[in-house]
């Protein structure tokens, strides 16, 4: 059978013409079409490493938002960004000082994974809205605590699963939800795996780094040099579930969206994984996981052993009359039959929440107080799929999962993985 391909490049002009514009209401605009200084969104940025530095500029929209403060445990980073942004921006090493500062309406969090929930909670409790990088949390219990806080305080929250702002991926999900592929029975999700690492000898702590604060609630270990500030921490379970969550949350999030299950989860999970035998890294390098939903849909989640360019990366929805795939690294969709690519979703059909630019969407929701396309509950549910996959692989057996109670029924061994001890004095 033939298949079709639709890329972002092919539809750029049409997408721009059809896109709902990013709008700040005229009542809030000053005489020159910009928000008055008192109405601009005051922004604080926490975590200025590779990812944090790259996304910071997306939130600096002239006349809409204004940088107030930056924060990183590396003083050299905060000094560099303060110089770049201007003297009016304050630099901090401790996030608690930033979130307590008046004049900051929203924070962008791009710290290591084990800090996502604690910093988000501090910001929400201080009355700030939050954009938090993915994955949401290293444990299910931390993710649930964040959901509860966001609801209690009425915070606007957006998760960094930016593929929800890809129009083509939204279309792929709408094609599946509206049964243009017939009855959905299987979702195939694939993402690149990670790698093993050598043993890392202790290194002197650089004077510009607050290493104790970098560790936070994680176990205290000697400073490992490049392994920590070079991103290798993403493969160590003290800080995260590994690339199964760091990268895997993207296509799993799309799978949840297209299955109509992004506020719940599967009822069974089983899998096998390949873990390093020694060295600094201890999270899965490769995996094969199968999950089953209450609606009968099977989700098969695999890795490509760190092949970022594999055409298998993404989320493929298979139905009784065809399939459609959101191809992760090409930002395109594939379909069989190809006629699916010409699908127009009618006014009486299922339409998903629309966002065409993740950063602008967050700023607009901060002003309008509308729910984002990836709120805390949705972020938590997508991240949970990564976490229970890892638990099933580590235990090496099929597990039943209760998505309502968020526990493994009558399975004390598996439930022990749902939370972890926090190094004093840190707590949620």
Q: What is the role of each PLM region?
A:
Residues 212-295:
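Rossmann-like dinucleotide-binding domain that binds NAD(P)(H)
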Residues 47, 180-197, 210-224, 267-276, ...:
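NAD(P)-dependent dehydrogenases' Rossmann-like dinucleotide-binding region
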Residues 14-86, 163-166, 255:
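N-terminal Rossmann-like dinucleotide-binding module
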Residues 287-356:
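NAD(P)-dinucleotide binding in Rossmann-like oxidoreductases
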Residues 13-37, 282, 365-428:
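C-terminal helix-rich "cap/oligomerization" subdomain common to oxidoreductases
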Residues 117-165, 179:
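Beta-strand-loop-alpha-helix segment that lines the small-molecule cofactor/substrate pocket
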Residues 1-18:
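N-terminal secretory signal peptides and thylakoid transit peptides that target proteins
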Residues 148-155, 171-186, 203-205:
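Basic phosphate/pyrophosphate-binding loop/patch that engages nucleotide-derived ligands
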């Amino acid at each position: 059978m033939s298949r079709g391909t639709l890329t972002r490049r092919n539809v750029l002009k049409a997408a721009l013409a059809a896109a709902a514009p990013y709008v700040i209401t005229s009542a809030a605009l000053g005489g020159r079409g910009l928000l008055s200084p008192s109405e601009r969104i005051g922004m604080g940025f926490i975590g200025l490493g590779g990812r944090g530095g790259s996304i910071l500029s997306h939130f600096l929209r002239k006349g809409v938002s204004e940088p107030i403060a930056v924060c990183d445990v590396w003083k050299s980073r905060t000094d560099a960004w303060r110089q770049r942004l201007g003297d009016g921006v304050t630099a901090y090493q401790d996030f608690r000082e930033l979130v307590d500062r008046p004049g900051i309406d929203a924070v962008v969090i791009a710290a290591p994974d084990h800090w996502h929930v604690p910093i988000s909670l501090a910001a929400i409790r201080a009355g700030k809205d939050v954009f938090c990088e993915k994955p949401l949390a290293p444990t299910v219990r931390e993710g649930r605590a964040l959901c509860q806080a966001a609801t209690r305080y009425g915070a606007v929250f957006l998760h960094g699963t930016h593929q929800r702002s890809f129009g083509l991926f939204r279309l792929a999900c709408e094609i599946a939800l509206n049964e243009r592929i017939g009855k959905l029975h299987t979702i195939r999700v694939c993402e690149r795996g990670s790698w093993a690492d050598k043993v890392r000898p202790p290194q002197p702590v650089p004077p510009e780094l607050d290493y104790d604060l970098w560790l936070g609630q994680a176990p205290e270990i000697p400073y490992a040099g490049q392994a920590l500030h070079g991103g290798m921490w993403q493969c160590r379970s003290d800080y995260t579930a590994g690339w199964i969550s760091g990268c895997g949350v993207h296509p799993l999030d799309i799978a949840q969206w297209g299955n109509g299950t992004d506020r719940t989860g599967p009822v069974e999970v089983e899998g096998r994984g390949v873990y390093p035998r020694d060295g600094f890294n201890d999270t899965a390098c490769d995996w094969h996981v199968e999950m089953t939903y209450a609606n009968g849909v099977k989700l098969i989640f695999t890795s490509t052993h760190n092949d970022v360019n594999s055409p298998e990366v993404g989320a493929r929805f298979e139905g009784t009359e065809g399939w459609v795939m959101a191809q992760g690294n090409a930002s395109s969709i594939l379909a069989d039959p190809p006629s699916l690519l010409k699908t127009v979703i009618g006014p009486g059909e299922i339409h998903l929440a629309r966002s065409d630019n993740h950063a602008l969407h967050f700023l607009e929701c901060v002003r309008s107080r509308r729910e984002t396309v990836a709120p805390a509950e949705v972020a938590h549910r997508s991240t949970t799929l990564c976490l229970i996959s890892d638990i099933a692989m580590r235990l090496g057996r099929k597990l039943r999962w209760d998505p309502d109670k968020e526990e493994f029924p009558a399975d004390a061994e598996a439930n022990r993985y749902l939370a972890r001890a926090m190094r004093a004095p840190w707590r949620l």
